Design a protein with these regions (language model features):
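Conserved class I S-adenosyl-L-methionine
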Residues: 61-71
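Nucleic-acid modification enzymes, centered on SAM-dependent nucleic-acid methyltransferases
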Residues: 6-61, 82, 87-252
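Glycine-rich SAM-binding Motif I of class I
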Residues: 73-77
Length: 252
């Protein structure tokens, strides 16, 4: 199935087609192009449906689009790409945060890239200071939770949900997110990236809607690598959205 309803107009590729096919003559397309793929969200309707409705009603920068149940922000993202002012309402704090992050990005990614570098430096320092030359296996879960700078509260069965290295890694990333919370967008962007990779970090099956323990714990979990890799994909997609929708996208 092709995602773009219209691929070309007067032999010129449409903006949606460019976003779904960032490379010319690509053999595959993205079902969650741009910011839509930043965080998995069960029950989210296709972005192409929103795009089609906006086009049908000929919405423009002179209109105001309201999504009273915005979820993860699919409608808000499409409105942002099309230059349509939009407002979303969402009761779930997590969903509201994801929608803000997906629709509120700055098209200039230099600030995000700088914070990614700072995250890497912070992570290596905090991780190594805690280990103090020892192996992670020499520490207990309780010692990781009691780590100076940790803000994750003790919870039941954390030894089943996370390996020690994964719990320590998440703890350090969360510490950094809190440290930079004065920059609300960047801190929420990084939190979204962390949450998006949580199924790959924790001892859970990734292919089920309800979280369930894995039969075998994940080994050699590198939280920083997973989070930074996702952040860089987010940066790449911002650049793609800026290019594919340069005629309509506006600053947040």
């Amino acid at each position: 199935m092709k995602l773009s309803i219209v691929q070309k107009a007067d032999n010129t590729p449409t903006e949606q087609y460019l976003l779904e096919h960032p490379k010319e003559n690509a053999k595959s397309w993205s079902s969650d192009p741009g910011a839509h793929g930043w965080h998995r969200y069960v029950g989210r309707f296709p972005a192409q449906l929103v795009r089609a409705i906006c086009n049908y009603f000929d919405l423009s920068e002179n209109d105001l689009l309201l999504d009273p149940f915005c979820g993860s922000g699919t409608t808000l993202v499409e409105a942002r790409l099309l230059g349509i002012p939009a407002v979303g309402i969402e009761i779930s704090p997590l969903s509201a945060m994801i929608s803000r992050v997906k629709s509120g990005f700055n098209v200039d990614t230099s600030d995000i890239e700088e914070y990614i570098t700072r995250l890497e430096e912070f992570y290596y320092e905090k991780y190594e200071v805690f280990l103090d030359g020892k192996d992670i296996s020499e520490y207990s879960y309780e010692e990781i939770i009691a780590r100076d700078g940790n803000s994750i509260c003790a919870f039941s069965n954390y030894d089943k949900w996370f390996t020690k290295e994964a719990l320590l890694g998440v703890s350090v990333v969360v510490e950094y997110i809190i440290k930079i919370r004065n920059n609300r967008y960047i801190s929420e962007l990084m939190a979204t990236a962390l949450f998006a990779k949580m199924r790959s970090i924790g001892n859970v099956d990734v292919d089920v809607v309800r979280a369930e323990y894995r039969k075998t714990p994940r080994e050699n979990v590198n939280v920083l690598k997973l989070v930074v890799s996702h952040l860089k994909k987010m940066v790449k997609s911002i650049k793609e959205m800026k290019f594919s929708h340069k005629s309509t996208i506006k600053e947040a």
